[in-house]
Amino acid sequence: MRYALLIYASEQEWANQAEEESQAQFQEYMAFTKDIVDRGIYKSGEALQATATATTVRVRDGETLTTDGPFAETKEQLGGFYVVEAKDLDEAIEIAVRIPDVRRGSIEVRPVMEIDMPS
């Protein structure tokens, strides 16, 4: 089964990291990603730009409304994600606890819906 591992942490903390800490964390992410690729469980993943670059889109009464930034202000922001293949939730959690930002933020583990798309 595929699981989305959604990485939440404080953008403020990311921005205030010392350069050495930032580089060390980047290397941790590269090692983690290489490991899950080598194990054949990596399906996709991306880092996201800061919430200041986001636009939220809604349609109300047929009118398209856009707002700069995320829809909800929270202490932790979605900073990236991985999609991995795991046999069950326990294995997905075992993978999630190795993501570097789990030590300062949180990782939401969510099963991906399996939908057969028509050809």
Language model segments and positions:
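Conserved, structured core segments of small domains
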Residues: 1-119
